[in-house]
Amino acid sequence: MANVLIRTTEGDITVRLYDETPKHRDNFLKLAEEAYYDGTLFHRVIKDFMIQGGDPDSIGAPAGKSLGVGGPDYTIEAEILPSLYHKRGALCAARQGDEVNPEKRSSGSQFYIVWGKKYSAGELRQMEKQMQMQQEQTVFNGLASKRRDMIMKLRRERDMAGLSALQDELLAETHAICASMPKPQFSAEQKEAYANVGGTPFLDGQYTVFGEVESGIDIVGKIQETPTGRGDRPTSDIKVVSMEVMR
């Protein structure tokens, strides 16, 4: 287990990297030791959500420049674990969306630190329902894609009865598959954290969480309050001055 001191123009943040996510841990340590992050900006900041950095293109970037696509020429295999979640202070890997990145591979350098908000028990229950509906939709879409040729044939023939029967068949298959899968839901620990500490539970299962803030959460809170402009970029630059690995 290793800690990294992130010195910023707003103050110091110390993060602890998880051994459960070794690919992300080792990559972050390597880049920190190479001074890769020195001079980069927190280029995307959203109040009550998160602060994002790690884009090398942000070094010396003029005001108004669009940022967020820079990084090394590799991505990192997802290490998404149910036990590591998006509580306030979680250190997570940014990534491209599912439409171009269905394997949820992480950016080689960009990261974000969660701020989020507190959620009531009712809000978390509603979120669980949405997660379960999303699981069913994902399974249904996967089954439908395998029957694409049949669906197109029935549509060409305008066979509404055939389409309806096929839909019923796919729905029955979907329900059977989902019944055999773990139901998406928050653990008691997650519920307590999201109710009492805060975070972004809707990101769980979608992004790799590979560390957490050990000290300096007040600095994260200060940064997420900063005024922003186009592209959620702070109107005044907030820089990573340097990083120091503390093993």
Residue ranges and their predicted role:
Residues 1-247:
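Cyclophilin-like peptidyl-prolyl cis-trans isomerases
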